[in-house]
């Protein structure tokens, strides 16, 4: 037990760690181009933040949070998602005092106690963006454009954008009445969870994954039929902007997202098999829910990195391989150790990926190891090489050897990389 990781977690190393790093680097590169600043918030927050922000009736709050009492009996929760913590930090640090909208991104661990499955873990890592301060649909379009670019660059080029509008608090109340009336006619055929949901928050029934419930909600009232004038105009402007930018989309009235803070626009990117790659939407009431003195519109999205990695593998998308070791510096004799490591340090300072021997192996064993780790070139340094100031650099693929002054090795490797 002590040598086994907890259920629903991963150890990151080797190729998986490298692929995860590529995804995170791409996220940071794109956010830099969009002038979105990185934010890091605590791994844990006061439980009430998620109860008020995410929503008391959500599965996340009711069933999936890792919550505990600290040594002073304060209720603390490991963050199940990134938005609530980012908005809390935005408010606490008075970021709203800055002129213009505030655009933040994070790459963070998140924790949910749910049944582990492919691409879904109890500890996962989330790339998310929060665009705070704009009520314009252009804010949604900016995030949708960023995600579209991200998915194309990472290799998931067939992802499709699905959008919906679930309205604001006012039109949602009218819709909930109509939905509840409809659901009551089919209550006997709903799953036990949805029978509870329909009383507390009927919109959650639309999100149910049980086949019987999915069949029932096919004919349920649609949120877009109950939008007030403002929400309707917002949704129409969003569609117009997407058309103008040639971003294809599909209106999917089954999207409501699983968190209570969403208003107006909700969206998901799905693959060809209909599995969600990432999702987000507008949450104009979340800031006010956390701090009643503030009322600031916002929009954001979250993307599970493990989920992206899972679909990259499933769809057989090849990512760039790890950079090869450019040079292995072999050591012949104890007297050459210091000088060899001096060369290694110089090469690394030039940005050349370099390895050497730390195990006092024979030269034959060192060359075998260099071949095993995929070194592109090797060089052996011993007393003769140091005395002459010359050494032979061997290309491991062709077997070709080139005699060089020691001080020219770095330039040679860089030129032939």
Curated annotation (Swiss-Prot):
Protein EC? 6.1.1.21
Signal peptide span: none
Q: Which UniProt keywords apply?
A: Aminoacyl-tRNA synthetase, ATP-binding, Cytoplasm, Ligase, Nucleotide-binding, Protein biosynthesis
Q: Subcellular localization, per the record?
A: Cytoplasm
Which residues form each disulfide bond in the chain? none
Record's protein name: Histidine--tRNA ligase
* Primary subcellular site in the record, as a coarse category: cytoplasm
Query: Could you tell me which HAMAP family the record lists for this protein?
Result: His_tRNA_synth
Q: Which reaction does it catalyse?
A: tRNA(His) + L-histidine + ATP = L-histidyl-tRNA(His) + AMP + diphosphate + H(+)
């Amino acid at each position: 037990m002590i040598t086994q990781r907890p259920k629903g977690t991963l150890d990151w190393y080797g190729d998986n760690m490298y692929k995860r790093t590529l995804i995170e680097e791409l996220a940071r590169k794109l956010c830099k181009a969009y002038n979105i600043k990185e934010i890091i918030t605590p791994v844990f927050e006061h439980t009430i933040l998620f109860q008020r922000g995410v929503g008391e009736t959500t599965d996340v709050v009711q069933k999936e949070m890792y919550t505990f009492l600290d040594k002073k009996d304060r209720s603390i929760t490991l963050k199940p998602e990134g938005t609530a913590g980012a908005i809390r930090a935005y408010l606490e640090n008075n970021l709203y005092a800055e002129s213009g909208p505030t655009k933040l991104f994070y790459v963070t661990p998140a924790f949910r106690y749910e049944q582990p499955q492919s691409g879904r873990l109890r500890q996962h890592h989330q790339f998310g963006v929060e665009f705070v301060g704009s009520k314009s649909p252009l804010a949604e379009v900016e995030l949708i454009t960023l995600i579209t670019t991200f998915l194309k660059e990472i290799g998931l080029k067939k992802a499709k954008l699905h959008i919906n509008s679930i309205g604001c608090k006012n039109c949602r109340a009218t819709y909930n009445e109509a939905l509840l009336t409809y659901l009551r006619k089919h209550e006997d055929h709903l799953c036990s969870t949805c029978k509870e949901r329909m009383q507390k928050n009927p919109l959650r029934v639309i999100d149910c994954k049980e086949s019987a419930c999915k069949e029932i909600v096919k004919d349920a009232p649609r949120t877009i039929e109950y939008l007030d004038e403002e929400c309707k105009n917002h949704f129409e402007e969003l569609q117009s902007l997407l058309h103008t930018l040639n971003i294809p989309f599909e209106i999917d009235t089954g999207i409501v997202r699983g968190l209570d803070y969403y208003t107006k626009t909700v969206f998901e990117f799905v693959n060809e098999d209909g599995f969600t790659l990432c999702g987000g939407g507008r949450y104009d009431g979340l800031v006010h829910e956390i701090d009643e003195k503030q009322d600031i519109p916002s929009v954001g999205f979250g993307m599970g990195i493990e989920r992206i990695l899972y679909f990259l593998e499933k769809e057989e998308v090849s990512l760039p391989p790890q950079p090869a070791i450019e040079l292995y510096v072999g050591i012949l004799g104890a007297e050459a150790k210091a000088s060899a490591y001096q060369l290694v340090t110089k090469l690394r300072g030039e940005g050349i990926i370099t390895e050497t021997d730390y195990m006092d192996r024979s030269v034959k064993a060192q060359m075998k190891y260099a071949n095993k780790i995929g070194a592109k070139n090797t060089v052996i340094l011993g007393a003769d090489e140091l005395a002459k100031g010359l050494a032979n650099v061997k290309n491991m693929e062709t077997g070709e050897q080139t005699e060089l002054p020691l001080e020219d090795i770095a330039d040679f490797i860089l030129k032939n990389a």
